[in-house]
Amino acid sequence: MNIILFGPPGAGKGTQAQSIVKKHNYFQLSTGNLLRDEVKSKTELGADIEKLISNGKFVSDEIVNTLLRQSLTNLKYRDRIIFDGYPRNVEQATNLEIILKEFNQTIGHTIFLNVSRDIIEKRIMGRMTCEKCNMTLNEYFNKEEIELHPCGVEHLKKRNDDNLDIIISRYDTYMSSTKPVLDFYSKNSNFTEIDGAGEIDQITNKINEILKV
């Protein structure tokens, strides 16, 4: 069964997608990667995509649909895909259903990792990275680990590029544009909303339970 996993920036989609890939032998399909791979392949379509991107223009749904169809012809992907970053709107969601139907496939589960903006802010702005061992901790969620960090607290530094205004803007834009998609999928019995504010392992366990059904 194919899976759609979506949620706002900072919700932990990438972490959970990788967990599903490893544990359940799935393939993570990102439209961004599809576009980049097509450009690298030096095809005529890839050249068109590169031109659009370099000119700051959006790649049309028609092109994305073509790449999705190409991927679905690969039998190793059959009913083993995690759709990452797609669909982003209702038209894309409708297109995806049509394309999957062409290949006698469906979406088995749609999982939404819901995380409040407050938690996202703390996750991003509270990040501290050890300049010696590169371990990443969070001053809001890992207070005890920070105090006991073997390299010493003095080596934990915050990143300069964690810009709160950018994070807030991305979050608000995502939630606004995704609301219609949520409404589209939430009517289905295979839709599950998970509180993405919990511990990573707890969220992973919830997803694993869902995939057993």
Q: Which residues fall in each region the model found?
A:
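Glycine-rich phosphate-binding loop of ATP-dependent small-molecule kinases
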Residues: 1-213
